[in-house]
Amino acid sequence: MRTVKLSPFGLAVWDVDIAALSQAAADALAGLIAINKVVVFRNQSGGDSELVGFLKQLGPLTFTAGETPVAGAPDLNVVSNLGRSTPPRSVFHTDTSYVVCPPAFTALREVMLPARGGQTVFSDQVAAFLALPPAWRSGLANCTVQHRTTGLDGQSQTHDHPLFRLHPVTAETALYLSTPERCSHLSGVDPATSERLVSILYRRSIRASNLYRHSWKKGDVVIWDNRLTMHQADHSDVDGDRVLHRGMVMGERPIHAV
């Protein structure tokens, strides 16, 4: 296995076939993902069934209601700009945070890449937490955030999660947020203050110095730890068709950092 550190965080990996891993090797890679937050597996030749098999080695799979399943691989969903007259809307978020046990890992497999653009951008939520002033860390230590669904026809779901989340493997503390549209209330403060604080924390999280921008290549499989990151698709300068297949691994109930 050959690895290269990405900047400012993340890891690129060569000479690993995710379709041919022992369970022990998959367990080791789960730790590698947690440590590096984002891992890019280069030159993967497998398809949907191989991606599903790899993800199942990391844990039970989960699927977000309202997404479009991949034909022949219903555990995966399609991420695509095909047939759209306007670019898809994407903002920084963490996946499906409004359920009791949000996904621990999300993976994307390259299917079709545009001639230009279409990066996936990640924020380091551990660095975002560490950059908070000490008074903020202490003052917000016991806060929870109500996460909610947006945009799912006829469906509404909410759940409260700690603002400062402890990672069960690395013992790091992350600033656990999603897009402000999905963070409806911060505990212990009035609605106006809640909205202002969530907006400030969110903007601090997505400063340019805190972002890894992934430029896709043929054969890429990218997997990240939702407990430690947010992500966004950059559709601002896409020239051509962009199709990815996504799978998610169920996580644990978020733990308060103490």
Annotate each predicted stretch with a short phrase.
Residues 1-221, 226-258:
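Non-heme Fe(II) oxygenase catalytic core, chiefly the N-lobe of the double-stranded beta-helix
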